[in-house]
Amino acid sequence: MNFMLRRNGGQFQKFGFFIRCNSTESFYSKAILGLKKDLKQAMLAKDDLKKTTIRNMLSTIKNKEIDAKDTKFDEFTLFGIYSKLINQRKDSISDYLKNNREDLAGKEEQELKLIQTYLDSLPIASPQEIDTKVEKFLNDLKEKEGTVPMKDVFSKVDWNTLTKEWKASQSMIKSSIVSKYKNIF
C-alpha cells in the first residue's frame, strides 16, 4: 500500500491528517515559540503592556543571538537575559520613585512581574538550591582532602556533569563557590 507523506514543519501530512513527529527541540526554542504565541495572544487581546514587554524580551534575546553567533543557547542563557531585564526594571522603579513618577514606576512593576513569571517557568535550580548543593560539595571536599586552595576547588569540579545534574549554569555555580568558600575553608 502506497502512502503519500509530505513534510510540513515538524509534522507529516497523510491524506489530510497531521502526524506529529517526536521532536528533539531544545527548551530554548520551545521557550521562544511560547513567547511568540504569547505575543500573538497579547496582540489579539490588545494588551499593550504585555505586548511591549514580550517584544522587548524577544528583541533582547535576538540581539544576544546576533552578538554571540557561534554560541549554543539554552535555558541558562534565558535565565541570564531575564535576570538582566528584571534588574533593569528594578533600577528604573527606584529611579522613578526618586523622581515622584509613581505612574511610570507602576508600569515598570507590572513589566517586572510579567518577566518574573517567565523566569520562574525556566527549569533551573534556584540560587538557594545551588548554594545548598555547593555547601555540601565543599564540605565533602574538605572532609576528603582538608584545606584546598580555591583555584584547586575549580579544577576538582566536573562541569559537564554538575551543570546537568544541578540544573545550573557554570557561572551560577562558580559565583556560589566563591561566596561559600570563605565560610567553609
From Swiss-Prot:
Q: Name one GO molecular function term.
A: carbon-nitrogen ligase activity, with glutamine as amido-N-donor
Q: Which residues form a coiled coil?
A: none
One CC-aspect GO term = mitochondrion
**Membrane-crossing residues?**
none
Pfam families attached here? YqeY
Location of the protein in the cell: Mitochondrion
Q: What is its main location?
A: mitochondrion
Keywords, A to Z, come to: Mitochondrion, Transit peptide
Transit peptide segment? 1-22
For this chain, the family text in UniProt reads: Belongs to the AIM41 family.
Give the protein's recorded name. Answer: Altered inheritance of mitochondria protein 41, mitochondrial
Question: Which species?
Answer: Vanderwaltozyma polyspora (strain ATCC 22028 / DSM 70294 / BCRC 21397 / CBS 2163 / NBRC 10782 / NRRL Y-8283 / UCD 57-17)
